[in-house]
């Protein structure tokens, strides 16, 4: 493309993204491309099923970009994959689509994100079962857990696991027919095929897969469009009856998909349902340690731990924080990211993030001391009698659980102890309460007093 053509196309993409939902933009716009602009006509390569959407929703975008870049009224000529050399006659009404062109669409595209793999997925206690189940499905699709239903809040790695499964299956069998799609985009495709009267093609596309990966299936429950759930039900049955693997993700359990037909809910529970919860501190540190390799900055350990303490709800917040820091560091030409710099960079993000109630570590020490009959001074000191050691370790555990302080900061509040001592105490108590119900009850009692 010429320089002006590049500017023109980038402006179209920019305007389209600002006006459309992200999922709609990704589905209808991202795979289109500009072939040329000649004689005030823009030739755009497009999936034929998406032409109607462009004509109805993006005409003004193209006109605006045309006047901005070429100072001219730019009309559009859509070309399809097997027809790039010929022009398609435009019509604003009674639009006719070439069935021959639609039937000549290429083999299924997976739409997987190649950057997501099992190797770069950070495991922790909160996602261990989901990872194990995903690996089992990737190794023996259609036999172990079918369907696999992964649920959890946003930004916890569900999409990563879906793509990791698909990429692993294709690595093992490049000829496998794999499809990743959001429920929202499944609905979009359904609507398009209904309009074009090409439902047989939709059925052929989805019912002949080896692996179907559906993200955010709860979106299907929100739609009342007649026939959408019916079509997915039939697709599910066709795949399952042929021992083809289905993996679904959701922000809630199958039983809480209230607007979904009961027969679908029942089928979602045929296989295995696994949950992903927010990452614990160690996992957040591991995620950050992995992510910072993408940046050309030095992150001291105390900065990493500080950031891990600031965002405890999902991975996206951590990734967003690193982008904020990168922006500030590049602007200030800083190579080493200190805690102060990190705090400055994420200030705005923290204002939009649910904040943990500020609890002084001294308050935790006081309540733990009262419960176990020891003083705060003894908790901070080095005396190692059994009851004092237990109180000290419980207080460190609660300081980690109930505050966003870094390990070094907590250690400083406990007589200047090293961060490794705090981590040891935290892990010890965390493991003990799994086996010791009485200790778990004691800690819950103390937590209630602190709150």
Curated annotation (Swiss-Prot):
Binding site for ATP: 155, 157-159
Region span, Domain II: 101-110
Region (Domain IV, binds dsDNA), start-end ranges: 330-451
Keyword ATP-binding part of the UniProt annotation: yes
InterPro entries associated with the record: AAA+_ATPase (IPR003593), Chromosome_initiator_DnaA (IPR001957), Chromosome_initiator_DnaA-like (IPR020591), Chromosome_initiator_DnaA_CS (IPR018312), DnaA_C (IPR013159), DnaA_dom (IPR013317), P-loop_NTPase (IPR027417), Trp_repressor/repl_initiator (IPR010921)
Any one of the GO CC terms: plasma membrane
Keywords tagged on the record: ATP-binding, Cytoplasm, DNA replication, DNA-binding, Lipid-binding, Nucleotide-binding
Top-rank taxon, per record: Bacteria
Record flagged with keyword Nuclease: no
UniProt-listed CDD domains: AAA (cd00009), Bac_DnaA_C (cd06571)
Annotated region described as Domain I, interacts with DnaA modulators, given as residue ranges: 1-101
Record function comment: Plays an essential role in the initiation and regulation of chromosomal replication. ATP-DnaA binds to the origin of replication (oriC) to initiate formation of the DNA replication initiation complex once per cell cycle. Binds the DnaA box (a 9 base pair repeat at the origin) and separates the double-stranded (ds)DNA. Forms a right-handed helical filament on oriC DNA; dsDNA binds to the exterior of the filament while single-stranded (ss)DNA is stabiized in the filament's interior.
NCBIfam families assigned: DnaA
Name of protein: Chromosomal replication initiator protein DnaA
High-level lineage: Bacteria, Bacillati, Bacillota, Bacilli, Lactobacillales
Gene symbol of the encoding locus: dnaA
């Amino acid at each position: 493309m010429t320089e002006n053509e590049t500017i023109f196309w980038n402006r179209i993409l920019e305007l389209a993204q600002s006006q459309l939902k992200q999922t709609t933009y990704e589905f209808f716009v991202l795979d289109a491309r500009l072939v040329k602009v000649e004689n005030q006509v823009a030739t755009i390569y497009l999936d034929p099923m998406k032409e109607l959407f462009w004509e109805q929703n993006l005409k003004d975008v193209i006109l605006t970009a045309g006047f901005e870049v070429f100072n001219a009224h730019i009309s559009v000529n859509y070309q399809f994959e097997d027809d790039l050399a010929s022009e398609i006659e435009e019509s604003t009404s009674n639009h006719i689509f070439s069935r021959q062109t639609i039937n000549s669409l290429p083999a299924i595209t997976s739409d997987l994100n190649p950057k997501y793999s099992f190797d770069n997925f950070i495991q922790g206690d909160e996602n261990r079962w989901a990872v194990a189940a995903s690996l089992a499905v990737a190794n023996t699709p259609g036999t172990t857990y079918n369907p696999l239903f992964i649920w959890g809040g946003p930004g916890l790695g569900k999409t990563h696991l879906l793509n990791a499964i698909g990429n692993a299956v294709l690595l093992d069998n490049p000829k496998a027919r794999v499809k990743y799609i959001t429920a929202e985009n499944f609905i979009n495709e359904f609507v398009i095929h209904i309009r074009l009267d090409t439902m047989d093609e939709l059925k052929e596309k989805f019912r002949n897969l080896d692996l179907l990966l559906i993200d955010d299936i709860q979106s299907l429950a929100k739609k009342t469009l007649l026939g959408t759930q019916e079509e997915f039900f039939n697709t599910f049955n066709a795949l399952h009856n042929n021992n083809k693997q289905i993996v679904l993700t959701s922000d809630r359990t199958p039983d809480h998909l209230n607007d979904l037909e009961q027969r679908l809910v029942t089928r979602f529970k045929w296989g295995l349902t696994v949950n992903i919860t927010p990452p614990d501190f160690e996992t957040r540190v591991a995620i950050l340690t992995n992510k910072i390799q993408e940046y050309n900055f030095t992150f001291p350990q105390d900065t990493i731990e500080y950031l891990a303490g600031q965002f405890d709800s999902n991975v996206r917040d951590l990734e967003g924080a690193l982008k904020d820091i990168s922006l500030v560091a590049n602007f200030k030409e800083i190579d080493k990211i200190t805690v102060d710099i990190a705090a400055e960079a994420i200030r705005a993000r923290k204002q939009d993030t649910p904040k943990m109630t500020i609890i002084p570590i001294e308050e935790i020490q006081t309540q733990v001391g009262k419960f176990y009959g020891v003083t705060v001074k003894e908790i901070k000191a080095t005396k190692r009698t059994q009851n004092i050691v237990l109180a000290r370790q419980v207080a460190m555990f609660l300081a980690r659980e109930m505050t966003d302080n870094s390990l070094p900061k907590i250690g400083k509040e406990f007589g200047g102890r090293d961060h490794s001592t705090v981590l040891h105490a935290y892990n010890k108590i965390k493991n003990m309460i799994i086996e010791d119900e009485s200790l778990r009850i004691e800690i819950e009692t103390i937590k209630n007093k602190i709150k």
